Amino acid sequence: MISFHEARSKMLEGIKPLPPEKCRLEDLLGRILAQDATASFDIPPRDNSAMDGFAVIASDVAGASEQSPVILQVIEDVPAGQVATKSLKPGQAIRIMTGAQIPANADSVIPVEETSAGISNTEVRILRAVRPGANVRRQGEDVTSGQLLIAKGTRLRPQEVGLIASLGLTEVLVSKQPVVGIISSGNEVAAPGQPLK
C-alpha cells in the first residue's frame, strides 16, 4: 500500500492540461481562465465628469467664493452618456452629469453643490474656485488599452467576471473542467446508512 501523498504525486504526474473551451460570461464563476484578458480600449474611453455639475474653464473661476461668486453663462445641458455640441468659450459653462464626456475647451467640473442658480436657467453662480482637472476622470485612468487585466490560469471570482464584462466580452476561453470520480473498494466499506463494523 502507498501513502496518500505518494498516490497523489503519481496521479498528478500523469495529468495533462485539458484543452480550452469557450465559456459564456454568465457561466464563468469558478472557472480557470485559459487566455490572458487584456483591455482592447481605455476605461474610461474619454475624459468624463466625475460628478454632476458644470464644466468650466478653471481660469474663469479662479477667484470665485461665496462672498464673491463668478457668474457664467450656461450654454448647454449634457446628460450622462451624451456629448456636448458646443465648445466652451471664456465666461461660459456647460451643465454636465456624471459620466458625460468633458466638452471641448473645458478643463474642470464644479460640483452642483458649489453653485447657486443665477437670474435665469441660462446662468450659474460659481461659489468656489477649482484647479484644472478637478472632478474630471481622465481617459484610461482606470484601464489603458493593451493592459493585462487578468492573467491566464486565474480562477475567476465575481470581481474578475465583472472586469471581463466591463471589457464588453460575452465569452472567453477557459480550461475545460475535468471529470473526477472516486472509487471506494474493500470489504470494510459500508453503504450509506449502514452501521460501521
Please place each PLM-identified region on the residue numbering.
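Short, low-complexity N-terminal leaders and the immediately following helix N-cap/first helix
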Residues: 1-68, 95, 138
